[in-house]
Amino acid sequence: MIEPWLYLQKRYGESVASPEDADLIKAASELFVESLPGMTEADYSEHGAAHLRLGYDDGPMYVIEISRLGKATWEEWADQDYENEVCPPRSLQVTEQKALTLWKMLKEKRIEDVRKAFA
């Protein structure tokens, strides 16, 4: 069986391969706690989301994007090039804790649980 890969794309551009729970916690906090010195609303808006991707080289790929305003979006792709969408994206409003829970479920490959959360 081919092992999946997992990447966290943090709010300010840092990419983390095989993130630990601590990486997910920090990324969620960066989204919901906007307290960097010198940052303006426009700066925060420009860097408004982070996402976690779980996938296989030959597909499928799953993505949960979380925005700074608490919008979580679930995407399923047949490939890692974002070319063949399996189903339309689904969204819901989340708190920081719920965002973290969703990311952890994806990290643990609990795809059915994630689907249910977005149903």
Language model: regions and residue ranges:
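Negatively charged, low-complexity tracts enriched in Asp/Glu with abundant Ser/Thr
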Residues: 1-56
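Generic N-terminal initiation segments characterized by hydrophobic and/or small/turn-forming residues
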Residues: 3-5, 21, 28, 33, ...
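Generic preference for well-ordered secondary structure
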Residues: 15, 36-38, 83-87, 98
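General N-terminal targeting signals
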Residues: 23-25, 48, 69-71, 81-83, ...
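Ampiphathic alpha-helical segments that act as solvent-exposed interaction surfaces
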Residues: 29, 85-118
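Short, surface-exposed, polar/charged, turn-prone segments marking secondary-structure boundaries
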Residues: 33-38, 79-82, 105
